[in-house]
């Protein structure tokens, strides 16, 4: 059996699909071979956003979008294979997360769309998908799942570490020797900042946090956002656009006597993301020594600096310091979940998700 897997991740940032070709050794240690990104066309991004709130004709719109996503995922696989000089028959499976459009574990479901049967047909490769549903069925949140991979890849006997992922949502994994691993979604990462930046500058994200750095934090707005009850809920917990969307921000802004300048709102959103992350680490990871950051937020210098400022005495660095690229951690993690599925080994950490026990995650769509 080949030990090459393609991991695919398209997250809440909605910037596209990250694909990575990974070889695993017998212990499940990853060796990335090649990677590729296929950006989402704007029409696809808008179609995903339109499915976030409950609305009209959802089933038809969801299935039409699922077909389009399968085509994008197949394109990513094809171009990744071309880049790496590999053939479809060299690959054991594509482990594809799909695109989250609704996450409601308290109602017993989570929805990641993408026509995986069509992806298997187009790619000519086995597809493993639907990784979150089994954890939810077992009473868990179905998220975050990446800490299970991070525990094996990044634990240290000598350093108390937190692995921080800053995508659309931020989440942490506490990796302290001698303690049970925990992990949870802290709150917004880039999601609110990206949406605000696009609305007011036409740019999809704030390059290096420069726009935010030129603004001033608006204390009443920051206080209103920090009053969000989710932030003080105990873990396990998970969140997404179902809570932290444009409507949520509009409600906070609408309650102010007057609207701050857009740049000041951006500065406040950055401070809010950093504060949510720092507060979570300080409360749930006492004695922590280092924070290693992955995801798109690792490239936001202003955000990284603000997190470091709020965590004095702790090292804050991009996860490249531990030997893997920041932007590919989630895609590698889902490749690893595919590798675990093939061996019928559990892929969740109940201490992170709240599930009743370890579960094999995923469903197979044969080529």
UniProtKB/Swiss-Prot annotation:
Keywords: ATP-binding, Carbohydrate metabolism, Kinase, Nucleotide-binding, Transferase
This protein's record includes keyword Transferase: yes
Any Pfam family hit: AnmK
Catalytic activity, reaction form: 1,6-anhydro-N-acetyl-beta-muramate + ATP + H2O = N-acetyl-D-muramate 6-phosphate + ADP + H(+)
Keyword presence, Transcription: no
Molecular function (Gene Ontology), one example: ATP binding
Annotated residues for binding of ATP: 11-18
Matching SUPFAM superfamilies: Actin-like ATPase domain
Enzyme Commission designation: 2.7.1.170
Pathway in which this enzyme or protein is active: Amino-sugar metabolism; 1,6-anhydro-N-acetylmuramate degradation; Cell wall biogenesis; peptidoglycan recycling
Signal peptide from the UniProt entry: none
Function recorded in the entry: Catalyzes the specific phosphorylation of 1,6-anhydro-N-acetylmuramic acid (anhMurNAc) with the simultaneous cleavage of the 1,6-anhydro ring, generating MurNAc-6-P. Is required for the utilization of anhMurNAc either imported from the medium or derived from its own cell wall murein, and thus plays a role in cell wall recycling.
Family statement: Belongs to the anhydro-N-acetylmuramic acid kinase family.
HAMAP family (alphabetical): AnhMurNAc_kinase
Protein name: Anhydro-N-acetylmuramic acid kinase
Originating species: Chromobacterium violaceum (strain ATCC 12472 / DSM 30191 / JCM 1249 / CCUG 213 / NBRC 12614 / NCIMB 9131 / NCTC 9757 / MK)
Top-level taxonomy: Bacteria, Pseudomonadati, Pseudomonadota, Betaproteobacteria, Neisseriales
